[in-house]
Amino acid sequence: MTAEAPPDDDIIEPEMLLRAYATGIFPMAEEADDPEVFWVRPEKRGVIPLDGFHIPRSLQKTIRQGIFKIRLDSNFAGVIEGCASGTGERARTWINEPIRRAYAKLFEIGHCHTVEAWYEGKLAGGLYGVTLGRAFFGESMFTRKRDASKVCLAYLVQHLSRQGFVLLDTQFTTPHLERFGALEVPRKEYEEMLERALEGIARF
């Protein structure tokens, strides 16, 4: 992993951020109250093959029941707040103020998007990520009601496939994501996948 501070920790302009994604680099912070940001270029990258996504049987049942109403891009502020807030399972988060501001700017210009699960009129879970070319870079997800973020992920994969995306980048893999088909690929292989994804354009 490569990590270094950007020229100005408080300002990450959209153009700079998109150039970083195009070369396989993304920003993180140690924790939410740390004002500094560093850039990451992992030796191994997490991806979910869009044609290899696995939905566990219990989640299939939840999706069929239609418990959640799915919306796109209707509450970016609520989603990033949910992702940035610690929970019982995840007491620490890497989303600090500079990162919030940077992705809010990307959202304004159409390069950051949300998938949201709503339950009884309230935001129950969601995820957000960056789009560039035919690639979607998943950033973070959160849930306030069981399976909400999982339903969002399943919807995202279906939506990306339908819209012509070819790469779903999860940055890293976790046992949770591996249940859905996530796998690690070496940096060189990932960069080849990224190059192909950047050759075309897909609309979210």
Swiss-Prot record:
Transmembrane segments: none annotated. GO terms for molecular function: leucyl-tRNA--protein transferase activity. It holds the Pfam family Leu_Phe_trans. Its main location: cytoplasm. One of its GO terms (biological process) is protein catabolic process. GO terms for cellular component: cytoplasm. It catalyses: N-terminal L-lysyl-[protein] + L-leucyl-tRNA(Leu) = N-terminal L-leucyl-L-lysyl-[protein] + tRNA(Leu) + H(+); N-terminal L-arginyl-[protein] + L-leucyl-tRNA(Leu) = N-terminal L-leucyl-L-arginyl-[protein] + tRNA(Leu) + H(+); L-phenylalanyl-tRNA(Phe) + an N-terminal L-alpha-aminoacyl-[protein] = an N-terminal L-phenylalanyl-L-alpha-aminoacyl-[protein] + tRNA(Phe). Functions in the N-end rule pathway of protein degradation where it conjugates Leu, Phe and, less efficiently, Met from aminoacyl-tRNAs to the N-termini of proteins containing an N-terminal arginine or lysine. This is Leucyl/phenylalanyl-tRNA--protein transferase. It comes from Brucella abortus (strain 2308).
